[in-house]
Amino acid sequence: MGPQTGKRLLVMAGGTGGHVFPALAVARRLASEGWQIRWLGTADRMEARLVPQHGFDIDFIDIQGVRGNGLLRKLAAPFKVLRSVMQARKVIREFKPDVVLGMGGFASGPGGVAAKLCGIPLVLHEQNAIPGMTNKLLSRIATRVLCAFEGAFGSLGTTVGNPIREELVALGAKPRESRTEALKVLVVGGSLGAKVFNDLMPSVTARIAQLQPVTVWHQTGKNNLSTVQAEYQLQGQDGGVKIAEFIDDMEAAYRWADVVLCRAGALTVSELAAVGLPSILVPYPHAVDDHQTMNARVLVDAGAAFLVPQPIATTELLADKLQLLAGDRDELTRMGERARAAAVLDATERVAEVCRELAK
């Protein structure tokens, strides 16, 4: 379908990078074709900072999650949601979008209901293998339901993959250099860090280093750097370790790595597949409906990753997995190839195309 200059898209995505970054990929694609993009989010979550940084205007509504909270808050929730729906409807009436795209986060619920009330086509995209509560509810009124992983919505959803940045898709298409030197382990714990990685990786690194060379790039999360750094020093491993609270350039980190130790958020799993990297996945055990374990199964079942449930994660187990990979570089390469084979590389275009179809 050709360019649709002047068409308007309202994007609802927020709370975590797993919602915001896939939405940004779609927004950038349509903006490059002349679409006007506007965002609906909440003022106290990461979209308030990220979205304007990428050049898009954002409107805020007042909404908070209600799942798992106290009784009093649940009783007040319907009134708060009604107010949020009215706020979202005001934004929709002013912006007059041709399509509303909901990709998760607190604003998606009221925004999706408001889109239905205003008669605007609503497209949902679920990034996880198990749908969140908001998308489960909105799927009943959505015009189109899209999902990253097959079966997330049963027969109701169309599987399209997770939109990711074009730079990562391009990175995965490039041949990797021969893996002959020290094993390069990228440890990614997310913006707040993963305590299990921060606690175990210094001793894991020391254990591996007794048998073979290893280098580590460890992302600790906010306020954890000095503690983790001290532990690596205590283990005598600070020389071969790069430690950072955040990694701003994930493309560079993925390019550097031989293997990734990380959680199993939907975006992370999709990025690992796209760049063709083997991984050891330790799903966050308190994720709603244990959806990270289901996300991980995509790569594990493809033979591209090891699954280590957090309750059994130990220094010995993680070190054994990494030593296994360090000692068999051919298998490391094969796992990377299997990861790439499991990737859906045109997800951004698939979601954008649905928006184009509904905006005719």
From Swiss-Prot:
Any one annotated GO CC term: plasma membrane
GO biological process: carbohydrate metabolic process; cell division; cell wall organization; lipid glycosylation; peptidoglycan biosynthetic process; regulation of cell shape
Membrane-related topology note: Peripheral membrane protein
Pfam families cross-referenced by the UniProt entry: Glyco_tran_28_C (PF04101), Glyco_transf_28 (PF03033)
Main location: membrane
Pathway stated in the Swiss-Prot or TrEMBL entry: Cell wall biogenesis; peptidoglycan biosynthesis
Keyword Hydrolase included in the entry's annotation: no
InterPro entries in alphabetical order: GlcNAc_MurG, Glyco_trans_28_C, GlycoTrans_28_N
Localization terms from the record: Cell inner membrane
Residues at which UDP-N-acetyl-alpha-D-glucosamine binds: T16, G17, G18, N128, R165, S191, I247, A266, L267, T268, V269, S270, E271, Q292
Annotated catalysed reactions: di-trans,octa-cis-undecaprenyl diphospho-N-acetyl-alpha-D-muramoyl-L-alanyl-D-glutamyl-meso-2,6-diaminopimeloyl-D-alanyl-D-alanine + UDP-N-acetyl-alpha-D-glucosamine = di-trans,octa-cis-undecaprenyl diphospho-[N-acetyl-alpha-D-glucosaminyl-(1->4)]-N-acetyl-alpha-D-muramoyl-L-alanyl-D-glutamyl-meso-2,6-diaminopimeloyl-D-alanyl-D-alanine + UDP + H(+)
Enzyme Commission code: 2.4.1.227
Molecular function GO terms recorded: UDP-N-acetyl-D-glucosamine:N-acetylmuramoyl-L-alanyl-D-glutamyl-meso-2,6-diaminopimelyl-D-alanyl-D-alanine-diphosphoundecaprenol 4-beta-N-acetylglucosaminlytransferase activity; undecaprenyldiphospho-muramoylpentapeptide beta-N-acetylglucosaminyltransferase activity
Keyword set, alphabetical order: Cell cycle, Cell division, Cell inner membrane, Cell membrane, Cell shape, Cell wall biogenesis/degradation, Glycosyltransferase, Membrane, Peptidoglycan synthesis, Transferase
Keyword Cell inner membrane found: yes
Protein family: Belongs to the glycosyltransferase 28 family. MurG subfamily.
Job of this protein: Cell wall formation. Catalyzes the transfer of a GlcNAc subunit on undecaprenyl-pyrophosphoryl-MurNAc-pentapeptide (lipid intermediate I) to form undecaprenyl-pyrophosphoryl-MurNAc-(pentapeptide)GlcNAc (lipid intermediate II).
The protein's name: UDP-N-acetylglucosamine--N-acetylmuramyl-(pentapeptide) pyrophosphoryl-undecaprenol N-acetylglucosamine transferase
Gene giving rise to this polypeptide: murG
